[in-house]
Amino acid sequence: RIRCGAKIDNMVHIAHNCDVGEDVIIAAQTGLSGSTRVGRGAILMGQVGSAGHLRVGEGAFVGTRAGLHRDVPDGVRVWGSPQMEERAWHRSVAALSRLPGLLRRLRAVEKRLGLRRSRSEAEKEETE
């Protein structure tokens, strides 16, 4: 069911038994799995994907390319795949850019402490 005022962009898939509330905005290339309910005034940005039988709350915001695997409460902003609240997502994205430097520092500390393993030892340990 698609209710009054809903705006749906191109290449959006709305599966069986979905309920899209009033004044919802769904951007391009979004897919709603079966029995997903989207509350009034929610916004789903482009390339969002949802697992089935979920509820996106009223006034919720789902950022671009988010992968929904659980309900989104009313008024909450989520991003990412898997979904996380906006503040946590921003912190995660910022941390990713710092990983190469942190790995270099960790290797230097390991070397200084004599904890450095060879690559073959690490690979062997991972397969056990």
Could you describe each region identified by the protein language model?
Residues 1-85:
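Structural signal for interior beta-strand "rungs" in well-ordered beta-sheet cores
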Residues 84-127:
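Long, leucine- and charge-enriched amphipathic alpha-helices
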